[in-house]
C-alpha cells in the first residue's frame, strides 16, 4: 500500500455532515455606528492609542451567507440575494416546520463616543448564524 494521506480538518463534507445554515467570517475595519449594551446608538472610533501606538479597531464577525438566486443577473446588473432571515434551513422538513437562518449577536469592547464622551463600551456585533424553527401547523 502507498503512503497514507492525512485528512484536513475541513474535509468534513465528505462524511455527509453539513451545516444547517451557511455562514461566512470576515474582519470589519470600517464600523462607524453600533448599538451598545444599553441600546444606545454609539459612534465607533476608527483608531485607538495603546502604549503610544495607534491601532485600527477591527472586529471579527460571523454572518449568515447570502445566497444568490438561480439565474443571477449578469455583472453590472446588480445582485439581489436572499437576505438572512428569508432562506430556509438545510435539512428541515418544510411540510411540518417553518425555518429560517438568522444572525445572532454578542458584545465586544470598543472605543466609542456617545454624547461627546469617549469611553470603552460593549457594542453588539454578529457572532453566528443559527436556524430558527416554528411549527408549520399545530395539527399532528
UniProtKB/Swiss-Prot annotation:
Gene expressing this chain: ntf7
Propeptide: 1-7
Primary site of residence: secreted
GO molecular function annotations of the record: growth factor activity; nerve growth factor receptor binding
UniProt entry tagged with the keyword Secreted: yes
InterPro entries: Cystine-knot_cytokine, Nerve_growth_factor-like, Nerve_growth_factor-rel, Nerve_growth_factor_CS
GO biological process: cell surface receptor protein tyrosine kinase signaling pathway; modulation of chemical synaptic transmission; negative regulation of neuron apoptotic process; nerve development; nerve growth factor signaling pathway; neuron projection morphogenesis
Pfam families associated with the record: NGF (PF00243)
Organism, as annotated: Cyprinus carpio
Compartments it resides in: Secreted
Keyword terms: Cleavage on pair of basic residues, Disulfide bond, Growth factor, Secreted
Disulfide bond annotation, renumbered to this chain: 21-101, 64-129, 89-131
SMART domains on file: NGF
Name of the protein described by the UniProt record: Neurotrophin-7
Family: Belongs to the NGF-beta family.
GO cellular component, as recorded: axon; dendrite; extracellular space; synaptic vesicle
Amino acid at each position: 500500500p502507498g503512503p497514507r494521506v492525512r485528512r484536513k480538518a475541513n474535509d468534513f463534507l465528505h462524511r455527509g455532515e453539513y451545516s444547517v445554515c451557511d455562514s461566512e467570517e470576515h474582519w470589519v475595519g470600517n464600523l462607524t455606528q453600533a448599538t451598545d449594551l444599553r441600546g444606545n446608538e454609539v459612534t465607533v472610533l476608527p483608531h485607538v492609542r495603546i502604549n503610544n501606538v495607534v491601532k485600527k479597531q477591527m472586529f471579527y464577525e460571523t454572518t449568515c451567507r447570502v445566497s444568490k438566486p438561480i439565474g443571477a443577473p449578469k455583472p453590472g446588473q446588480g445582485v439581489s440575494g436572499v437576505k438572512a432571515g428569508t432562506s430556509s434551513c438545510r435539512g428541515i422538513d418544510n411540510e411540518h416546520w417553518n425555518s429560517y437562518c438568522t444572525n445572532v449577536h454578542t458584545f465586544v469592547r470598543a472605543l466609542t463616543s456617545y454624547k461627546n464622551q469617549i469611553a470603552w463600551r460593549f457594542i453588539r456585533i454578529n457572532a453566528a448564524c443559527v436556524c430558527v424553527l416554528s411549527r408549520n401547523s399545530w395539527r399532528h
